Amino acid sequence: LLWKNRDTDYLRNHVAYIKGEKYNFIADVNSANFPALKEAWMGTNSVGFALMNTQSYNLVEVKDGEERGAANGRIIYRALEVCATVEDFCHFLDTITKPSLIEANFGVIDAKGGAAMFEVDYYKYTMYDANDPKDAPYGYIARTNFSFAGEVNRGAGYVRYMEADRVLMRASAMGGITP
């Protein structure tokens, strides 16, 4: 399960069906600039690849005039068009032009049982595999607006993360969620 709370200044959003280059997909898009801008904020494609993001605020030192995470929506749109698996998404991130202008945590699941969280900056990423007990000892991975690989005590969403983790950990311990 991927779950996202879209806290954005863009109040008009809708779910669109998009005929992609390789795979068709449904995605949450900003109504005001769709389809002119090929941006999506979460979605699922025709082969069961699903992707969402949270803006991270502690991976990149943003320069004056730069928009934080300027490429995040374009990356989601493009990945939904061309990726089928978590491994495909790794390859996608490995081969995009750098600096990527990405600063985000991407949650990814696929129809083959793959599930991972990627903390992505302009040049590199850190992957956390939800199927690996060292990355997800309780069977889940949660993120808000900071990245574990980023600068400590910077970012946002620490209180939300602690609450989400508390709820998920209890549910996991009581059998309320299953990995």
Name each model-derived stretch.
Residues 71-99:
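Intrinsically disordered, low-complexity linker/loop segments enriched in Gly/Pro
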Residues 1-77, 104, 110-179:
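C-terminal, well-structured catalytic/ligand-binding subdomain of enzymes
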Residues 90-95, 103-111:
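Short, surface-exposed recognition loops or helix-turn segments adjacent to catalytic cores
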